A protein has these predicted regions:
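Ribonuclease/tRNase effector modules and their secretory precursors
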Residues: 1-106
Length: 106
């Protein structure tokens, strides 16, 4: 568990271990992506269920690494991290397009 900017982040120890093994990134390291003021958040309809709505966030960490992070909200201020990895080329393009829309640039 980690608290950051009035949010609490939780995760499964097993999922975190798998994420470190598969993506070389812990959830504790990935959580600050939520501080990115331009974080793109999309509904992850393919993996959502009636019991759990999942979201995909694309944002920059403090070290300029662009991440894709899957999460759900357990309560208003509790975010459960499910997966985190470096963004794909397409996700990076989506993020840049969002920045361009915000600032009106090409």
């Amino acid at each position: 568990m980690l608290s950051l900017e009035n949010k609490t982040f939780t995760w499964s120890k097993d999922k975190n271990r798998d994420n470190i093994k598969n993506h070389r990134l812990s959830f504790r390291e990935a959580a600050p992506v939520f501080l990115d003021p331009y974080l793109v958040v999309l509904h992850d309809q393919a993996h959502s269920t009636m019991e759990e709505t999942r979201w995909k966030g694309i944002g920059v960490l403090h070290n300029d690494l662009l991440l894709s992070i899957i999460f759900s909200e357990e309560k208003e201020d509790v975010i459960r991290l499910i997966s985190a990895r470096e963004a794909t080329k397409k996700e990076k393009e989506d993020y840049r397009e969002n920045i361009n829309r915000i600032f009106g640039t090409q």
